[in-house]
């Protein structure tokens, strides 16, 4: 079963994206490079709780 998670920008903390995460990968937190409108650049986005 997949779980819905929110991704937040590492620089400004803005929660820009939501994605689905499989239950098999629940142990480690997602870290994805995405575009942030607030920072106006591509930054690392981390999974929030």
Curated annotation (Swiss-Prot):
Organism in which the protein naturally occurs: Bacillus licheniformis (strain ATCC 14580 / DSM 13 / JCM 2505 / CCUG 7422 / NBRC 12200 / NCIMB 9375 / NCTC 10341 / NRRL NRS-1264 / Gibson 46)
InterPro entries named in the record: Ribosomal_bL33, Ribosomal_bL33_CS, Ribosomal_bL33_sf, Ribosomal_zn-bd
Top-level taxonomic group: Bacteria
Protein name per the record: Large ribosomal subunit protein bL33A
Gene: rpmG1
GO molecular function annotations of the record: structural constituent of ribosome
Disulfide linkage: none
Gene Ontology, cellular component aspect: cytoplasm; ribonucleoprotein complex; ribosome
Annotated family: Belongs to the bacterial ribosomal protein bL33 family.
NCBIfam families attached to this UniProt entry: PRK00504.1, PRK00595.1, rpmG_bact
């Amino acid at each position: 079963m997949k779980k819905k998670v929110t991704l937040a920008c590492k620089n400004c903390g803005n929660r820009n994206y939501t994605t689905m995460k499989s239950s098999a990968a629940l142990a480690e937190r997602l870290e994805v490079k995405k575009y942030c409108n607030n920072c106006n650049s591509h930054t690392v986005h981390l999974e929030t709780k």
